[in-house]
């Protein structure tokens, strides 16, 4: 968790215009979840088990090569196991991230949580390997799957995230979902919070513009 949080921090502070960064952890050993990570992200250089962090850089070949060299030094990538996707691998990979394909066939609840980047470590520490989730926006956007008939866990997650200056909405409800708090409706206040959080670490909208709402 500390390594991923540190990598996100370095990515956010990089001057090399990284346009996206996401972390996909190991799936929890729980039969209530669909174990599909390996299938969803099966590419030539990603056909292996385990969690991984992915980042995207865009531009012409010379620019990409130069920035990739700089980023490799910034993140100390020589000490980590890495793979590089070509254009025809990268496009479908990020499409799968944006389309939430990890949760495509789930009948469970799916939550969306937005938190300040500095709180990423705390949220990861809360979720650990108990939930199926992934992180986007270099640590500020969490997509969390919570099993059906476990509304109390949704409440616990929501309370913790709100205490850490974030908010939660539900984007997919399970058949037996029975949670009625207004926290799960999108309103102007949450939109403003989302904008403020994203602008704090992405003032020029490099990270997946339009990912959350048209404006952000």
What would you call each of these model-derived segments?
Residues 1-106:
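C-terminal substrate-binding/cap subdomain adjacent to the FAD-binding core in PCMH-type
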């Amino acid at each position: 968790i500390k390594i991923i949080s540190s990598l996100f921090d370095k990515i956010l502070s990089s001057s090399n215009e990284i346009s996206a960064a996401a972390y996909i952890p190991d799936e929890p050993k729980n039969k209530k979840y669909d174990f599909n990570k390996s299938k969803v992200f099966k590419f030539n250089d990603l056909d292996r088990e385990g969690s991984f962090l992915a980042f995207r850089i865009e531009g012409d070949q010379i620019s990409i090569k130069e920035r990739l060299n700089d980023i490799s030094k910034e993140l100390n990538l020589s000490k980590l196991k890495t793979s590089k996707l070509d254009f025809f691998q990268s496009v479908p990979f990020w499409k799968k991230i944006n389309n939430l394909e990890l949760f495509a066939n789930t009948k469970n609840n799916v939550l969306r949580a937005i938190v300040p980047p500095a709180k990423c470590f705390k949220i990861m520490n809360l979720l650990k390997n108990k939930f199926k989730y992934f992180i986007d926006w270099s640590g500020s956007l969490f997509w969390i799957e919570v099993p059906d008939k476990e509304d109390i866990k949704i409440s616990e997650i929501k309370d913790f995230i709100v205490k850490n200056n974030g908010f939660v909405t539900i984007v997919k409800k399970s058949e037996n979902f029975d949670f009625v708090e207004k926290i799960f409706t999108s309103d102007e206040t949450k939109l403003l919070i989302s904008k403020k959080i994203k602008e704090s670490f992405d003032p020029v909208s490099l990270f997946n513009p339009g990912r959350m709402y048209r404006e952000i």
